[in-house]
Amino acid sequence: MFDDAVATQDTVTQLVAAIRRVARCVPSAGEVVAAVCMLDYTRPGKPDIDWDDPAAKADLVSRLVNDALAVLAVLAVLCGPDTPGRDDAAADALGLLALVAGQDVEPADGSDGTGGRWVIARKVAPDRVISTVDRQARHTRKSRSQRRDGYRAHLAAEPDTGLITDCEMTMATGQDNTDAAVGVRMAGRDRFHPITEPALAEEDGGLEIHGDSAYGSGQARADYRDAGHETVIKPKPLTRAVPGGFTADDFTVDDPAGTVTCPAGHTRAMSRSRTVTFGRLCADCPLRVQCTTAKTGRSMTIHEHDGLLRAARAQARTPEFKAAYPTRAGIERTVAHVATQNGRRVKLRYLGTTKNDAWLHTRAAALNLRALLRHGLTRNAGVWTLATA
């Protein structure tokens, strides 16, 4: 994760900035804002209230949201998509205002949303915009205790040399930006280990892909398999419904038959959504204390790629996997070189994924050049060569 180049904005700051942007960018919006809004948006900074008074802050949130909704309602009529003078900047400003007016707030207690009373929601909206200055920066969690704002960088590298073979900067949230999804994309556009049809037929032409558990989703493993790659990716640990009790691997899944058999030998059919409920079969089961605490008995959802995930967990227990997996640790040094400078984490200087992705590629190229020079890269008779031992 890289920290973004802008400050994370609170809800009040975002609403004020978004309304001001609409007033600047949308035709006739300045007059609309002055006419329908309760607050004065021509004054710089935040509205002047007693910030130590919770009631005053709550009232300000309601006023800001109501102002935003009022502006949007009027401009939806006066400045539709076909209005002369409306350009991309105007459309973006209106879209941003609509987004920030709803992403962080919810109706106050006892309100159905029509009374004009709003409060800041006690949750983080999925894919939340954290700044009106950089609308692609996102809030995410590296773990339950580590929260970060910015962008996510992905690297592919050769474990023996540490040379970076591919990289990509993405937003920190979104299904297309997960480690697993980007890992599959990078493997698919690999230019250094081309796979030919004869190689696929011989089953020796794919890559050997190493990664931590974030790169090993069921879909990613299926994609790697279909592309002819081998994986040395750590599986995610299984959770137990009861401490010390059974895991999903203690249940037998028969995909062709569409059934699941529990450790006690009871078999149930899976539903179309791949859920299975053992229900009353658990009532007198002697193994219940190891299986579930639910009054209605054990229920579970079987993953679409359950077979691949089970195979990955079985692979992780083999001596071959345990010997090969530490290879991935060598890439951590490369990651540290990309993410830090003189012992400090690098902070991005650009806005948006496009410019930051270009910066990441430039940094990766520079680090590769440094690594090659360290390995003896030299220029001989106009040709770059690596010195041999």
Regions found by a protein language model. Name each.
Residues 1-389:
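Anion-binding and metal-coordination hotspots
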